[in-house]
Amino acid sequence: MSGAADGTVPVGEDTHQEDSGERECEQRPVHSGREATGESDPALERPDHGERHGPEPRFPSFSVRPEAAQPPPSRTIARESFLGRFITDCLKWKNDVVKIDPNICKDPFPSDDEIFGNIGSHSTLLRELHECAYRYQKAVNASHPLLQRDGSLKTLNYGVQPFIVTVYGPTGSGKSQFLRNVISSKMIDPPPETVFFVTPEKGTVTNEEKLSWEAQCAEGVYNSKCVPITKTFQPAFVNLSFSEAVDEENLSIDSPNNVFVQAAKKGPICIIIDECMNQLGACRSISSFFHALPSKIFGRFPACTGYTVLVVLHNMNPRSDRGNIKDLKIQSKCHIISPQLESQQVSRFIKNFSFGFPTPLVSVIKDIVDHAKMHSKFSWLVYCSVPVRESFRWSYYSPEDQLTPLYVDLQAVMYEACHNIRRVFCKRLYSRVSYANKRKWYD
């Protein structure tokens, strides 16, 4: 009591107060951050000086307006779309050509439903098919304005001059009638006003044949409304022997007696050499008749807007030749072949001139020739080395359908598209089979 009255604290009490202070410090938690505080812990806030502040707003981690779920990317292609129509045409073409040669599109080949249902998942294949479809449509748009209403070609040359044509066909294949049809059907542009008919001998043309030539030559200078399309009402028909045609006077453009120069001063001319294969193979070199003379006459006389040479051969590979027939083939811008010719010669020609399109398509052209040989005796396969459009390089002539293009370039595009489809889907099928085999092995 005396200690308390004196104002001093007893030793025991002092020790108790110190121990309680230490325990209070030990029980007080140490906060390392805002996240470490609990609900029962005092808030780590600034001292309140009488101003009341609301709690700090906290934004939710999720979006207030959640985005709508996006549908998965579509793998299908509409058949009515531009690419869908192209794929449909390719598959239809594939079903037709495999009947000719199954090696063109080998099995296994995916079905139509599988192609249209899963093609959207192959971006590289879609890009390749779009490129093929673009090239296909571009070629179609370029060729369509140059065709007639029935889809046939208007002419053989489409204004290409000078124009040298070689016709191959055995005896009895209708070569003479075909040449007359070429003149009368205006298949040479422009129509000739003078026609030179060269034979081995001058008197070998009978009066009946001469009248037929004159009548069909006159038919070729009038349109369907009987309106003349040239400066003459009756084209001149001149019969020459082979020796006269290749005479030195007629091979020199400066000779005043050159019959070809005299006719070129009046208008377009056409020279037809028929039944002269033996003379071409046995005579001296007359290569200038096929390359120097046509270009010089066509370039010197403005009235001669057309210079056409039609040469008839019975055989593609004659036994004797001094270089004239070889030069003729080199200078020829158009080769017309009868299906009645020997099959080996036709096949060799197609293989030699099939550059630019896939080799499997050779069987398609051969099938056309074989079909024509069996069903159409007076039909012809036409190859043009300088076409105005690539689609017109190969064509087919028949008296019923006239001159129809084969569109080999478009078939090459379809072949490329089918090849790409098969490559991608067969690889996918192989992956599926390989995966299934591995699962069986592990199981």
From Swiss-Prot:
Stated induction or repression of this protein's expression: Expressed in the intermediate phase of the viral replicative cycle.
Region (Disordered): 1-75
Subcellular location: Virion; Host nucleus, Host nucleoplasm; Host nucleus, Host nucleolus
GO molecular function: ATP binding; DNA binding
A GO CC term assigned to this protein in UniProt: host cell nucleolus
Entry annotated with the keyword Phosphoprotein: yes
Residues that, per the record, bind ATP: 169-176
Reported function: Component of the packaging machinery which encapsidates the viral DNA into preformed capsids and transcriptional activator of the viral major late promoter (MLP). Binds, along with packaging proteins 2 and 3, to the specific packaging sequence on the left end of viral genomic DNA and displays ATPase activity thereby providing the power stroke of the packaging machinery. The activity of packaging protein IVa2 is stimulated by protein 33K which acts as a terminase. May be the protein that pumps DNA into the capsid powered by ATP hydrolysis.
Family, similarity comment: Belongs to the adenoviridae packaging protein 1 family.
Quaternary state and interactors: Homodimer. Part of a genome packaging complex composed of packaging proteins 1, 2 and 3; this complex specifically binds to the packaging sequence on the left end of viral genomic DNA and performs packaging of the viral genome. Interacts with protein 33K.
Protein name: Packaging protein 1
Lineage of origin: Viruses, Varidnaviria, Bamfordvirae, Preplasmiviricota, Tectiliviricetes
